[in-house]
Amino acid sequence: MERRFIVYYNCSDCACGRYVSSLLTMSGAYVNVCVCIVFFILVYLSSCYNMRVLGFLRVCIYLYKLCR
């Protein structure tokens, strides 16, 4: 049960999205991209491959819209 919770946390892109959103008001876009890359690596090392791709693409699209 505990392991399932940890895997679910790694799979969700919610953590990365919220963290990047909170940083947007404090720092520049480059810092946010670096933070998201770190999250992407962490999720990449987990066992959930579909969610890591979807989450990373979602955050990248979100950052792309903000930069335009």
Curated annotation (Swiss-Prot):
Keyword Transmembrane included in the entry's annotation: yes
Protein name per the record: Suppressor of RNA silencing
Transmembrane segment boundaries: 23-43
Keyword Transmembrane: yes
Compartment(s): Host endoplasmic reticulum membrane
Family per similarity comment: Belongs to the virgaviridae suppressor of RNA silencing family.
Gene Ontology CC: host cell endoplasmic reticulum membrane; membrane
Main localization, broad class: host cell
Function: Suppressor of RNA-mediated gene silencing, also known as post-transcriptional gene silencing (PTGS), a mechanism of plant viral defense that performs sequence-specific inhibition of viral mRNAs expression. The RNA silencing suppression activity is variable depending on the origin of the isolate.
Source superkingdom: Viruses
Protein's organism: Potato mop-top virus (isolate Potato/Sweden/Sw) (PMTV)
Membrane topology: Single-pass membrane protein
Keywords per UniProt: Host endoplasmic reticulum, Host membrane, Membrane, Transmembrane, Transmembrane helix
